[in-house]
């Protein structure tokens, strides 16, 4: 009896230390109440670490979210792969995408506004160096994608499903020691779905993990690799039509490559931050302003185009993009504004992205021509 009791105790101890395997949930709506139940991210040795079967990824030019940093991951069921598509990948049922929003912090716990990458390629995020805010999950089920927002507790031990979202008043400190107030909003499930419905009536889709955003190198635990090549090696991507050098690629924000001039940087920024709504089938299609990667330069891209909004919404400026005159362009007015009734994007930020705005202003200033005649 004593031997059996000892064996049972050992088994129980082993079970306590066992990490949750990635959850396959092809259907149903009994979604886990806690993030740990998904098995995608583990708290291990003082770090938030992706599970062994889970791949981290990053984007060339990401969506701005009040200077939050983001740890992105992807997992697919064994033996399943996404099918390549230039505009969208066709992800298999059961795919789970996670995006953890966090801020770096100093030894005194002050949140920092910087662009440094805190991710350890082997271990993930050191919990004593970051403030975890939320983790958003996109789950591919048989009847489509589902968006699930999880909010981290102050102890950074667990994140809980919050259908209604959450609000946090944060203060960031820049390199000069100046404070920046952030009214951080965790979106509710409907807001998540609203932004991710890139084409009206076609349901939720991932916005970030597309070929033009993923086509870049990332530092993995075993060294640098192109993400598209790593996805193929992992068995997560099939049907790629050729070498990655021949595939679409957006500019690398903050560190543009030699072949990425100012116009490409600006267009990549607009694609990532505006194009999911401002495209011919998107929620903002009635504006006639199309800022996605496929849009041709011209009046529908905003050049000398009169805005649909007037008065306060346009800042009394006459055209969306006025060549040579960023201060006469509605586009820069709305990107700079933090007024909820004016600003674009209208969700996901309470501050102005100064670095992104600077790219747009310099690009518009460089454009030849005028809007006369």
Per-region residue spans from a language model:
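Bacterial N-terminal signal peptides
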Residues: 5-14
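Conserved small-residue
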Residues: 19-85, 91-93, 98-105, 116-120, ...
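A residue-level signal for conserved active-site and pocket-lining positions in enzyme catalytic cores
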Residues: 4, 94, 195
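Extended interaction-bearing regions that mediate binding to partners or small molecules
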Residues: 108-110
């Amino acid at each position: 009896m004593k031997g059996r009791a000892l064996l049972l105790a050992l088994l129980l101890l082993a079970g306590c230390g066992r990490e949750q395997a990635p959850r396959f949930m092809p259907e149903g709506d009994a979604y886990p109440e806690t993030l740990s139940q998904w098995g995608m991210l583990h708290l291990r040795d003082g770090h938030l670490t992706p599970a062994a079967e889970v791949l981290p990824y990053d984007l060339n030019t990401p969506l701005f979210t009040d200077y939050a940093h983001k740890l992105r991951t992807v997992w697919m069921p064994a033996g399943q792969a996404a099918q390549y598509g230039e505009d969208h990948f066709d992800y298999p049922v059961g795919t789970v995408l996670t995006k953890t929003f966090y801020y770096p912090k100093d030894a005194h716990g002050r949140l920092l506004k910087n662009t440094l990458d805190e991710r350890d390629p082997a271990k993930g995020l050191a919990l004593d160096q970051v403030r975890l805010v939320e983790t958003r999950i996109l789950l591919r089920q048989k009847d489509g994608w589902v968006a699930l927002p999880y909010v981290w507790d102050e102890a950074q031990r667990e994140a809980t499903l919050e259908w209604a979202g959450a609000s946090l008043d944060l203060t960031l400190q820049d390199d000069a020691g100046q404070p920046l107030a952030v009214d951080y909003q965790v979106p509710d499930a409907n807001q998540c779905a609203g932004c991710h419905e890139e084409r009206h009536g076609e349901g939720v889709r991932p916005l970030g993990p597309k070929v033009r955003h993923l086509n870049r190198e990332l530092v993995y635990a075993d060294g640098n690799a192109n993400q598209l090549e790593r996805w193929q090696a992992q068995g997560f991507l099939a049907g790629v039509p050729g070498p990655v050098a021949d595939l679409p690629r957006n500019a690398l924000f903050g560190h543009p490559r030699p072949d990425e001039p100012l116009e490409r940087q600006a267009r990549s920024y607009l694609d990532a931050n505006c194009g999911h709504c401002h495209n011919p089938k998107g929620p903002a299609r009635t504006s006639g302003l199309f800022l996605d990667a496929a849009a041709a330069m011209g009046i529908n891209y905003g050049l000398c185009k009169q805005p649909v909004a007037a008065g306060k919404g346009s800042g009394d400026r006459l055209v969306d993009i006025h060549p040579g005159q960023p201060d006469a362009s509605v586009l820069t007015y709305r990107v700079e504004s933090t007024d909820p009734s004016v600003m674009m994007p209208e969700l996901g930020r309470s501050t102005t992205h100064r670095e992104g705005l600077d790219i747009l202003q310099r690009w518009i200033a460089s454009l030849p021509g005028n809007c006369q005649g």
